[in-house]
């Protein structure tokens, strides 16, 4: 007879640990424990059966025992204890009213660095890119906050600097893909290292900082995200051969928002020294360019390399391709890949050789970013402390004037006056849309989300169809083929039967009998019905061969598909009713 096992020595009870027990084991306060878990990426877990853990079903927070044991070896534990000692000494000196001692203690404040945690949580650079969405959302949010008692000015300035550096990379790499204006903010989506990165940037309005938000927790996330984005920006700049941190004086023409008023004054005073430094940096970059390209992975080369190296890589791929393999497998050839790359490159240069001028009322911080990301040139008037753009409003090269007002006092010939939505719709359509529907004072078409992909059974608004047709320069009526213009189909069975009858009569069967045109539609309908019946019979036979589990799953899929179709029909009918009501109101007027 084996030894009787005691309760709590094996199974679920040994895999989970309550939060209070974990705090006692680590000898930390609850605030420090929460901060450590956020920095290390450890989150609470829900046991499958709470009663087996502690014998109670009360609401408690549990963690994996292995995660808590992992925290025992974290160097930040000692740093937190030093901070606790520092706070106690500082409080004691302030109570004794010793300003000299307080100043000396503040100079020796322990610094918490999370550099090692970034490498620990993201072993590869692609892992960091995948987890960049929340990081960018947090930093763009804090970059719009004003200075308060909780939010320090130095923290806000650092967020703005890192966000501007990231936007400058997106502009240089032509990585922006989609933009959407919502009531929450502006959604951006970029493709970096083959990974899709989506973030939201708030509108630059007066921000009212809420009081019911725990900024201590958000500050802990912000501390980690600041370090993460700093490392990511450094690596991204290295892939393009750019100097980091960027020389904002030289990049003013591409990202003027990244340079503050103080930097602009310093740039005017030290123009010669900056030019010499930039020349030295460029020379060093040219010398190390070949070595850096060899160290980069193939994915980085495909994104950052010039077009001539892309052409060489495609030619190499074509030479290495095996015709036998290509014939047996549906493998894209080098020419197909080259065409796809050329199409993608053209989509990122839709504003190439176009000159834009922004009026004062439009959101320059967003329009400048998206226009430059797609190869356009942009300028603006001087406003408050901001300096004017590279060219004036009367420049003859200007092709598009972005205005968000009913009318303008002065107009220039040879340029289009459009509203800001035209820029964003062109980006999402990947083509230059007609400007007739975006003129001054015009009722704008709906700004549809580019993140919604309609399926075969989903409802597609007429505006979406018109937008897709305009992007492809194809009229909506050309997408459907009239049945009367379709090529006539001849049933093989009818031809064989008539040939056999002609042979029995002794007629010449060299030529097939000409089909009467009146029976074409009927014959096509009969053939379609036969094909549909055969398809239904095949499906029923396949369902009989399914197991009960697969048949249930299949029925659920079919039911869901029918529900989508019914919902799409309801939306279509509702839209038709709304259009009829609108047309009736217009006719009455």
From Swiss-Prot:
Region (Disordered): 287-309, 503-589
Compositionally biased tracts (Acidic residues): 287-297
InterPro entries: BRCT_dom, BRCT_dom_sf, PES
Biased composition (Basic and acidic residues): 528-553, 576-589
UniProt-listed GO biological process terms: maturation of 5.8S rRNA from tricistronic rRNA transcript (SSU-rRNA, 5.8S rRNA, LSU-rRNA); maturation of LSU-rRNA from tricistronic rRNA transcript (SSU-rRNA, 5.8S rRNA, LSU-rRNA)
Gene3D superfamilies attached to this UniProt entry: BRCT domain
Subcellular location: Nucleus, Nucleolus; Nucleus, Nucleoplasm
GO cellular component: nucleoplasm; PeBoW complex; preribosome, large subunit precursor
SUPFAM superfamilies, alphabetized: BRCT domain (SSF52113)
Keyword Transmembrane: no
Family per similarity comment: Belongs to the pescadillo family.
Annotated function: Required for maturation of ribosomal RNAs and formation of the large ribosomal subunit.
Record's protein name: Pescadillo homolog
Organism: Monosiga brevicollis (Choanoflagellate)
